[in-house]
From Swiss-Prot:
It is found in: Secreted, Cell wall. One of its GO terms (cellular component) is membrane. InterPro entries: C5a/SBT2-like_Fn3, C5a_Peptidase, Ig-like_fold, LPXTG_anchor, PA_dom_sf, PA_domain, Peptidase_S8/S53_dom, Peptidase_S8/S53_dom_sf. CDD domains: PA_C5a_like (cd02133), Peptidases_S8_C5a_Peptidase (cd07475). The active site is at 130 (charge relay system), 193 (charge relay system), 512 (charge relay system). Residues 1034-1101 are annotated as: 4 X 17 AA tandem repeats. This is C5a peptidase. It comes from Streptococcus pyogenes. Residues 1131-1167 form a propeptide. Sequence repeats lie at residues 1034-1050, 1051-1067, 1068-1084, 1085-1101. Keywords: Cell wall, Hydrolase, Peptidoglycan-anchor, Protease, Repeat, Secreted, Serine protease, Signal, Virulence. The keyword Metal-binding does not apply. Belongs to the peptidase S8 family. The keyword Cytoplasm does not apply.
Length: 1167
């Protein structure tokens, strides 16, 4: 075996670094917080498809940030920022008695009122299931341990023994139990997330804390059960592990369990039975499970708006999809505890403004600042030396703005927003440079202020937010994949200050932060009900608390759209502990099942019936009214904003004491249907709230959300139409080449995981060098050393010419793609396999092949579950899924190759929504194993080095490529290049080849081979020496045209038909598509593609056309099978890692070779 080609060290280092980055992007557990660890680049919204969202939100390990107008290339930190702790401001320690809690300053959910009635959780146990914890944080403290449920380690061990729990440790009086359910024996890498979540639920920092304000959770006196669960052996095992944690938490006395993690778009039906039983067990014992909705926004993630033709754009997944859980969305309140800065305005008034710092400025120091435009040009920074640079957001990455300012001598950076009412953004840390983000309003004030001086305050304060009260952009929308209403309720989740590892505190954002606040409120409300309703069972009190909490929530209103945020985004509204604690009434659906109304499919006219419950001893007089609204549409996309249709008039009702009464509200949206169907042809949501007040002029007392779908929701299309059918060549995740809409490149030489995402059929293109090697007896493809590689391409695509590495759809006259295969075992277009962009979750996917009579000749194995391709992001999921089980090798049920002809390749699947019927996608596939017949003789002119064949090739399918190949040694790698025919059909043979280092290698006639390939992938090849021998007994000549002194006796060389060159192959009768031999078949003219060109034919060529981009060593071939692998349909992160590792390493080798040959080609061009 030849010595392997050495790889340049720097290229290897780059590849390994890229692999590391991509693998690190695959989070084991998708905690519902997002980090600024992986900055991303914003792109302009002018791209026609997919459209970018216009709202900005700060940082995510899991998803990319939304695009905004004016921000062409800007790296930002996403708005759900996970692990970005801030260093505490430099402040002097305050006496313990003066330390206020964070809630004393700002309590948008009014928890303090509930605490006054129900206490702070003393004697109660709460559980947090999460990825990791700092078990010894200073905030894990009880004020009076004599009131604790577990007084000692011995008490805990007794409880464990009663329930057969043989694991778990006592940490201290506060953390009564800790256990790692992942069983991986590793210390949690992420201790931040679980610590932050636990602090919101039950933190209780000491007065001696160095922070200016003391952290106090919703239930600060409750004991904690900390349960670490992380993905180790796949999602199913993961779900079983947290199911065990749920059972243990219930058995150890937890009243509430918080689960701030999830897997987007997974359906409840996908969970193992053990997990479903654990949810039911907790419910039966009256234990509340609170989950976060997720940070995946909607279908398309945070970088794309969903298409208005596909209304099933919800992405709330598991465990949040479980009906028994209380699922929490995130919103930003109108006021926030924040760092502040002070300036004097032109009228000498002090102006205080909120700032979000990355590296804090020295407090109480007056800084000069200078305006630096958008921080792009050197001239922008002419006045910033020794000052703070004030820079507008936009055009370039934040890190570049900061770096440019530092290079110019600035001492810090202030970046202000380029849009009104935006969320604050965490800026990247650039060499510890002090930097902060401010609102557009404040930035413009600083720009125009004549006094260019600013001071940063030492102590944070509560100030109005620039965004106002608004649902967080990242917060995941419903419905669930099963078609159920989620989320249930909303809570503050934007820039929440809580505990992180090592006795520190930080602001993080995400639905992970929203859930533990609601968990604490639920725990306190149930505690209140123990006294208020002593005759109820724990499960009855749990049911009541959930209904009251949702009923008393305040529906959030979008001031910009003058409509309520959708119930599919906010659930019942913003949690209000004060209203819940005082509530004597609540509202449910007509069956008293839950405090939300799911109407499923509706017509233009329908009714909403709800039940109002009065638990007081007096009759209650109420006024009620319904809002009717739908989705706002912007062009072809949902704007992810509400659109009000109308509001019904207020009506009056009296509810008897200790009784209930039904209310029916008629809805008539018929006058809007024509316009709405024109915007949303596949149907639309009609939704809103039925709201109740004690007086029409007063604030809302309670409300209930309702959702109906005007159309057939269950039978919405589950799969995007094939890319072959796209009029403009684009799909949701695929942007067409504007100059060649039918261009569809295979996986070959670049990392196409983020690009080739559409519905199509895949196949493989195998070069003749590998086919020849296999025919000559090489059993292991890894032992083949060749500059060519096997590529995964898309069926029906072909390269137009050898020096164009791109593939293009070739179509029949009727516009259908020319998808043809030749299942003869040579690895070249031998199979087809389904790849789909799923718009919805589906089940029971199966492929089958039908002959022209409609008989099923082959059926694949079943793929039971398919998850919608809700994003195109390495950290979450890709924009399409390949299904290995659907690979058809052109054989029937008995394993025999089918007869030549045209077949229907059908993929069947069923959406998992209730009432859905089976759907299918069809492709026409030609099967043809007819070997091309080629000339048996040729002549060669030594004068102009032209090779002239005696006849044209005869093929059953149109000729794809007719070429002369030659192979030479470039160092230790056999290198193959090709010559296309001249306009007259002759070939001009070169005398020598050039290596990558510029050396020349003489070519002999025996180095050349005539290769013909048809569009089904049938290949025939013949040595040129054989063709010349077929014409005369001319001795072999070397590259100079001279006769060698002595020609060694050669063994008979085989051509592509396995015949010896001294024996003319017997021509077999050519068969037509039915397998019958026609009386006479005329020579097939090459079929032209949609551009009028014949694939593979290059006019006026004849010179060597190098397959430069396709060169690779055998090390790359070893990974070729990875492109066939089915991408995970269960969102399994561990499996994703393996697939991505293969793809990345393949990319490295292909990309390296492409780079080397690109450099070589550039050198040749300069000559």
């Amino acid at each position: 075996m030849r010595k392997k080609q050495k790889l340049p060290f720097d290229k290897l280092a780059i590849a390994l670094m890229s692999t590391s980055i991509l693998l690190n992007a695959q989070s084991d557990i998708k905690a519902n917080t997002v980090t600024e660890d992986t900055p991303v680049t914003e792109q302009a919204v002018e791209t026609p498809q997919p459209t970018a969202v216009s709202e900005e939100v700060p940082s995510s390990k899991e998803t990319k940030t939304p695009q905004t107008p004016d921000d062409a290339e800007e790296t930002i930190a996403d708005d759900a920022n996970d692990l970005a702790p801030q260093a505490p401001a430099k402040t002097a320690d305050t006496p313990a008695t003066s330390k206020a809690t964070i809630r004393d300053l700002n309590d948008p959910s009014q928890v303090k009122t509930l605490q006054e009635k129900a206490g702070k959780g003393a004697g109660t146990v709460v559980a947090v299931i999460d990825a990791g914890f700092d078990k010894n944080h200073e905030a894990w403290r009880l004020t009076d341990k004599t009131k604790a449920r577990y007084q000692s380690k011995e008490d805990l061990e007794k409880a464990k023994k009663e329930h057969g729990i043989t694991y778990g440790e006592w940490v201290n009086d506060k953390v009564a139990y800790y256990h790692d359910y992942s069983k991986d024996g590793k210390t949690a890498v992420d201790q931040e997330h679980g610590t932050h979540v636990s602090g919101i639920l039950s933190g209780n920092a000491p007065s001696e804390t160095k922070e200016p304000y003391r952290l106090e959770g919703a239930m600060p006196e409750a004991q904690l059960l900390l349960m670490r669960v992380e993905i180790v052996n796949g999602l199913a095992d993961y779900a079983r592990n947290y199911a065990q944690a749920i059972r243990d938490a219930v058995n150890l006395g937890a009243k509430v369990i918080n689960m701030s993690f999830g897997n987007a778009a997974l359906a409840y039906a996908n969970l193992p039975d053990e997990t479903k039983k654990a949810f039911d067990y907790a419910k039966s014992k009256g234990v509340s499970i609170v989950t976060s909705a997720g940070n995946d926004s909607s279908f398309g993630g945070k970088t794309r708006l969903p298409l208005a033709d596909h209304p099933d754009y919800g992405v709330v997944g598991t465990p949040a999809a479980a009906d028994s859980t209380l699922t929490v969305a995130s919103y930003s309140p109108d006021k926030q505890l924040t760092e502040t800065a002070m300036v004097k305005t032109d009228d000498q008034q002090d102006k205080e403004m909120p700032v979000l710092s990355t590296n804090r400025f020295e407090p109480n120091k007056a800084y000069d600042y200078a305006y630096a435009n958008r921080g792009m040009k050197e001239d922008d920074f002419k006045d910033v030396k020794g000052k703070i640079a004030l820079i507008e957001r936009g055009d370039i990455d934040f890190k570049d703005k900061v770096a440019n300012a530092k290079k110019a001598g600035a001492v810090g950076v202030l970046i202000y927003d380029n849009q009104d009412k935006g969320f604050p953004i965490e800026l990247p840390n650039v060499d510890q440079m002090p930097a902060a983000f401010i609102s557009r309003k404040d930035g413009l004030l600083l720009k125009d202020n004549p006094q260019k001086t600013i001071t940063f305050n030492a102590t944070p304060k509560v100030l109005p937010t620039a965004s106002g009260t608004k649902l967080s952009r990242f917060s995941s929308w419903g419905l669930t994949a099963d078609g159920n209403i989620k989320p249930d309720i909303a809570a503050p989740g934007q820039d929440i200050l809580s505990s992180v590892a090592n006795n520190k505190y930080a602001k993080l954002s995400g639905t992970s932060m929203s859930a533990p606040l609601v968990a604490g409120i639920m725990g306190l409300l149930q505690k209140q009900y123990e006294t208020q309703y002593p005759d109820m069972t724990p499960s009855e009190r749990l049911d009541l608390a959930k209904k009251v909490l949702m009923s008393s929530a305040t529906a959030l209103y979008d001031e910009d759209e003058k409509a309520y945020f959708s119930p599919r985004q906010q659930g019942a509204g913003a949690v209000d502990a004060k209203k819940a604690s005082a509530a004597t009434m609540y509202v449910t659906d007509k069956d008293n099942t839950s405090s939300k109304v799911h109407l499923n499919n509706v017509s233009d006219k329908f009714e909403v019936t709800v039940t109002v419950h009065n638990k007081s001893d007096k009759p209650q007089e109420l006024y009620y009214q319904a809002t009717v609204q739908t989705d706002k549409v912007d062009g072809k996309h949902f704007a992810l904003a509400p659109k009000v249709l109308y509001e019904a008039s207020w009506q009056k009702i009296t509810i008897p004491a200790n009784s209930s009464k039904q209310v029916t509200v008629p809805i008539d949206a018929s006058r809007f249907s024509k316009d709405l169907l024109a915007q949303m042809k596949n149907g639309y949501f009609l939704e809103g709230f039925v709201r109740f007040k004690q007086d029409p002029t007063k604030e809302e007392l309670m409300s209930i959300p309702y959702i109906g779908f005007r159309g057939d929701f269950g039978n919405l299309s589950a799969v995007e139409k094939p890319i072959y059918d796209s009029k403009d060549g684009s799909s949701y995740y695929h942007e067409a080449n504007s100059d060649a809409k039918d261009q569809l490149d295979g996986d070959g030489l670049q990392f196409y995981a983020l690009k080739n995402n559409f519905t199509a059929l895949t196949t493989e293109s195998n070069p003749w060098t590998i086919i020849k090697a296999v025919k000559e007896g090489v059993e292991n493809i890894e032992d083949i050393e060749s500059s060519e590689i096997t590529e995964t391409i898309f069926a029906g695509t072909f390269a137009k010419q050898d020096d164009d590495s791109h593939y293009y759809i070739h179509r029949h006259a009727n516009g259908e793609p020319y998808a043809a295969i030749s299942p003869n075992g040579d690895g070249n277009r031998d199979y087809v396999q389904f790849q789909g962009t799923f718009l919805r979750n589906a089940k029971n996917l199966v492929a089958e092949v039908l002959d022209k009579e409609g008989n099923v000749v082959w059926t694949s194995e079943v793929t039971e579950q398919v998850v919608k391709n809700y994003n195109n992001d390495l950290a979450s999921t890709l924009g399409s899924t390949r299904f290995e089980k659907t690979r058809w090798d052109g054989k029937d049920k008995d394993g025999k190759v089918v007869a030549n002809g045209t077949y229907t390749y059908r993929v069947r699947y069923t959406p998992i929504s209730s009432g859905a019927k089976e759907q299918h996608t069809d492709f026409d596939v030609i099967v043809d194993n007819t070997t091309p017949e080629v000339a048996t003789s040729a002549t060669f002119s030594t004068e102009d080095r032209r090779l002239t064949l005696a006849s044209k090739p005869k093929t059953s399918q149109p000729v794809y490529r007719e070429r002369i190949a030659y192979t030479y040694m470039d160092e230790d790698l056999p290198t193959t290049e090709y010559i296309s025919p001249n306009e007259d059909g002759t070939f001009t043979l070169p005398e020598e080849a050039e290596t990558m280092e510029g050396a020349t290698v003489p070519l002999k006639m025996s180095d050349f081979t005539y290769v013909v390939e048809d569009m089904a992938g049938n290949i025939t090849y013949t040595p040129v020496t054989k063709l010349l021998e077929g014409h005369s007994n001319k001795p072999e000549q070397d590259g100079s045209g001279q006769t060698p002194d002595k020609k060694p006796e050669a063994k008979p060389e085989q051509d592509g038909s396995d015949q010896a060159p001294d024996k003319k192959p017997e021509a077999k009768p050519e068969q037509d598509g039915s397998g019958q031999t026609p009386d006479k078949k005329p020579e097939t003219k090459p079929e032209k593609d949609s551009s009028g060109q014949t694939p593979g034919k290059t006019p006026q060529k004849g010179q060597p056309s190098r397959t430069l981009e396709k060169r690779s060593s055998k090390r790359a071939l070893a990974t070729k099978a990875s492109t066939r692998d089915q991408l995970p349909t269960t969102n399994d992160k561990d499996t994703n890692r393996l697939h991505l590792l293969k793809l990345v390493m393949t990319t490295f080798f292909f990309g390296l070779v492409a780079h080397i040959f690109k450099t070589k080609r550039q050198k040749e061009t300069k000559k």
